[in-house]
A protein has these predicted regions:
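Conserved C-terminal helix/tail region of periplasmic/extracytoplasmic solute-binding proteins
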Residues: 10, 111-141
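Structured segments of extracytoplasmic/periplasmic soluble domains
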Residues: 11, 15, 30-33, 69-73, ...
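Venus flytrap/periplasmic-binding-protein-like
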Residues: 40-46
């Protein structure tokens, strides 16, 4: 197991492991650095990040405007030029100028999403104790 995002790709670059879980962006950077690494989205876990604001936040309106702005497809269409995690606004795929090969390699590309298993936070909320017990058992082996 790895302890940080940087470590997952470094383990592959140094040939310390033959297989690993990890974030596609880290593996893409390792590949750019010359590592012999590849991955597939087949049966991968599709996970999302999010923004949150505390209840009663004093600048809620500004935060909401920020979220509306960064969600616009014209901004997200440029995201693949900087990082390979892919846009979350599907309309960005219709307007991006990124090369087809790059676009089709993104996890959020419409051809890749059906291959993956979405992470269910609802499931983890309902099965927290069971999941923790199984994880601890796995880690102690």
């Amino acid at each position: 197991f790895w302890g940080s995002g940087a470590q997952q790709a470094q383990l592959m670059k140094d040939a310390e492991v033959d297989m690993s879980t990890g974030w596609n962006g880290r593996f893409d950077n390792a590949k750019k650095d010359g590592a012999k690494v590849g991955y597939t989205f087949n049966q991968a876990l599709l996970d999302y990040d999010c923004f949150a604001m505390p209840k009663g936040a004093p600048n809620k309106e500004v935060a909401m405007r920020f979220l509306a702005e960064v969600s616009k497809p014209q901004y997200q269409a440029n995201l693949p030029f900087y990082i390979t995690y892919g846009p979350t606004n599907r309309k960005a795929y219709e307007m991006t100028k990124a090369p087809k090969e790059l676009i089709e390699s993104l996890p959020s590309h419409p051809k890749n999403v059906p291959l993956m298993l979405p992470v269910s936070l609802d499931w983890y909320a309902k099965h927290k104790n069971e999941a923790l017990e199984l994880y601890m058992e796995l880690m102690s082996e």
